[in-house]
Design a protein with these regions (language model features):
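N-terminal, Lys/Arg-enriched amphipathic/low-complexity engagement segments
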Residues: 1-48
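Short, well-structured beta-strand-loop connectors
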Residues: 50-63, 82
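Conserved hydrophobic positions within beta-strands
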Residues: 78-80
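Flanking helices and flexible, charged tails adjoining ferredoxin-like Fe-S electron-transfer domains
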Residues: 102-127, 132, 137, 150, ...
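Histidine-anchored nucleotide/phosphate-binding helix
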Residues: 177-192
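Hydrophobic alpha-helical positions that pack around
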Residues: 196-308, 314-319, 329
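Active-site gating/interface segments in enzymes
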Residues: 232-236, 240-249, 316-367
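Ferredoxin-type iron-sulfur electron-transfer modules in oxidoreductases and energy-metabolism complexes
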Residues: 347-363, 373, 377-439
Length: 439
């Protein structure tokens, strides 16, 4: 049963008009490329090249470091300059391979892939794993692992997350409009892994052109359906999307597979098509650069490892000095202290905000208005959870389901007292989860 929406949520200014009509532009890096070994959930990748080695575009430079891991490929040709810790967009230092770009873009000779119709399920999964594909719309969970549930026959829905509900980001929107065929072909490949499953494309109703495009592409596909979802943040959250498209509910202790679902986003499914049908490893992605602080917001096809400062240059550079630069969306993304960091597998956007775009408020006392409760998609009481967090009361925080918070930021967005609810709850949630692992 498709409900097409969920309880709670908010309607922030979406800011998408800045970049939604800008076609995808291929950009080439100028300087060195930096490849962090941790661009995904799980074990870091392990370098298989050394300083001084010459590498080609499409060559594996790091292999998966375990079952839950993913290999990394060079996105340019050049020479390995050094392997050392470098900063990631999140601000942590991670062991990284630095490649000096020779500007030649010599590419490995890919072997002619086997016809998808002739491939076994194991061969399809291996192709996905070997390509280094991870979730490109969230935390970067290795896709081969996600597509390998213990009981595949119990999976009856493959959900393509086409919501792109975060404000400003238009990368998936442009991907669907310009390369929607890759998304549909990728869904066909995934459906070959799950005999009993149906493919659902969940698209918010503020993207009628995407809905029309996907309906046209799937009109002769009986195992696929395009669902027009109500526009509301965080419609693209995994739990909210599953509930809106299937009517099934999951909590933080469950995986989507426990509800018979697998969820992947537009970029990930498109990468699956290119890997399985064309033999191409995961080497680049679409990144939105937006915000009033840049001259020409747009959508760029950027190779992994490219310096994010170069992407901002591709968007015309700064119009004014930005007050804040965010990696990801303004609701769930994070502020960066430098743009001298690489584009990674999970880099969906770079948002450069002016002082006028950034809220500057001093928090005051809670007025018990209940707005945070009304908008919470996890049906929690954020004001109370924030109180527990501020008093370091982990027991009460856990007892009142604080671990169910998805840190969407809806509560902070509507709070008239401007309390930093998301930050307080998120901090305590991380502490509680870390302590749980120690037990």
């Amino acid at each position: 049963m498709s409900l097409l929406t969920f309880k709670g949520g908010v309607h922030p200014n979406d800011g998408k008009a800045l970049a939604k009509d800008k076609a995808i532009v291929q950009v080439q890096p100028k300087g060195d490329l930096v490849y962090p070994m941790s661009q995904h959930i799980g074990a870091p990748a392990v370098p298989i090249v050394a300083k001084g080695d010459h590498v080609l575009r499409g060559q594996m430079i790091a292999e998966a470091g375990g079952f839950v891991s993913a290999p990394i490929y060079a996105s340019v040709s050049g020479t390995v300059k050094v392997i050392e810790p470098r900063f990631t967009p999140a601000g942590s230092k991670v062991n990284s391979i630095v490649i000096e770009n020779d500007g030649e873009y010599e590419e490995v000779e890919y072997s002619t892939p086997q016809a998808v119709s002739e491939m076994s399920k194991e061969e399809i999964l291996n192709a996905i794993g070997d390509a280094g594909i991870v979730g490109m719309g969230g935390a970067g969970f290795p896709t081969k692992v996600k597509l390998s549930p213990k009981e595949p026959d119990k999976i009856d829905y493959i959900i393509a997350n086409c919501a792109e509900c975060e404000p400003y980001i238009t990368a998936d929107y442009r991907q669907i409009l310009e390369h929607g065929e890759e998304l549909v072909e990728g869904m066909k490949i995934i459906l070959r892994l799950f005999d009993n499953a149906k493919g659902l494309f969940g698209v918010e109703d503020n993207k009628p052109d995407c809905i029309e495009k996907l309906k046209e592409l799937t009109k002769d596909e009986p195992r696929m359906e395009v669902l027009k979802l109500q526009t509301k943040y965080p419609q693209g959250g995994e739990r909210q999307l599953i509930y809106a498209t299937t009517g099934r509910a999951i909590n933080s202790s469950m995986l989507p597979a426990d509800a018979g679902c697998v969820v992947d986003n537009v970029a990930t499914i498109s990468a699956i098509y290119r890997a399985v049908a064309k033999g191409e490893p995961s080497m680049d992605r679409i990144v939105t650069v937006s915000g009033d602080a840049v001259h020409e917001p747009g959508n760029f096809k950027a190779p992994f490892g490219m310096n994010q400062a170069e992407l901002i240059e591709a968007a015309g550079g700064y119009k004014v000095d930005p007050e804040k630069i965010i990696s990801g969306g303004p609701m769930m993304g994070f502020s960066m202290f430098t743009v001298d960091v690489p584009v990674t597998k999970t880099s969906s956007s770079i948002l450069c905000f002016t002082k006028d775009e950034v809220a500057q408020y001093e928090p005051t006392a809670c007025i018990n208005c209940g707005r945070c409760v009304e908008v919470c998609p996890s049906r929690l009481i954020p004001s109370r959870l924030a109180d527990y967090a501020e008093h370091h009361d982990e027991e009460a925080f856990t007892k009142h389901e604080g671990l169910e918070c998805m840190e969407c930021g809806s509560c902070s967005y509507v709070c008239p007292a401007k309390r930093q609810l998301k930050q307080a709850i998120g901090s305590m949630r991380k502490t509680a989860l870390a302590n749980r692992k120690k037990k």
